[in-house]
């Protein structure tokens, strides 16, 4: 049976690769991006998110089987959080009623391996509290210093992965039968990274931060395949996970013990 997918960031990169794969499988895709997609909208502000959700729901006839949120930027500016966090969360929440109309609703978002890098705890907390003005103000402060501007990106992705973990087990999502998960790529070769990887110096800088011992840099298709499975009817029980599809970067950086936490119970 043909399913209807809504994909943000569908004009390029992981979003385009995912849309192409789904269309090859005979699925219906409603893309959202600034230009060149079925729905053209700017997800950096609340009005654009609301417009995108309304237009996608209308095109889908009120029933959406899966939402895949790929839209994002990596610039060291506050707008990164507006798009990467609020542009994802508000879009998903606005599309939830249409997802509930599906017999097998699914949702997935694109986080990043950068979620493991240094962040601004204040910005992450502001995002999770839904305080966009404060989050953007904190982002502007980070952007004013070249040594901290990058934390706009890592903080936006950390907040997104934490939101997925919280929301996935809530009555709104789990209670509605909607598996919600995230995928965290390593260094994906897209328009976002191509210029940086084009020089030996740039590539060395990236590889030092994101070591990928398995197959090195990855094509968008490697993430698309995972997103397609996560949002298929075959995924009945995976929820709240950020899956690091990153060539082993997470395993290199965090090592073999990711089960230790401050209040872990004693055996």
PLM regions and their residue ranges:
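Canonical Rossmann dinucleotide-binding motif of NAD(H)/NADP(H)-dependent dehydrogenases/reductases
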Residues: 1-30
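Hydrophobic structural elements of the Rossmann-like NAD(P)H-binding subdomain
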Residues: 68, 108-110, 180-183, 193, ...
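A glycine-rich helix->loop->beta "capping" turn
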Residues: 55-69, 74-79, 103-105, 179
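Short, flexible catalytic-loop segment of classical short-chain dehydrogenase/reductase
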Residues: 184-195, 199, 204
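Rossmann-fold cofactor-recognition segment
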Residues: 32-49
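C-terminal helical subdomain
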Residues: 90, 152-154, 158-161, 182, ...
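Catalytic loop of short-chain dehydrogenase/reductase
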Residues: 72-73, 77, 100-176, 187-188
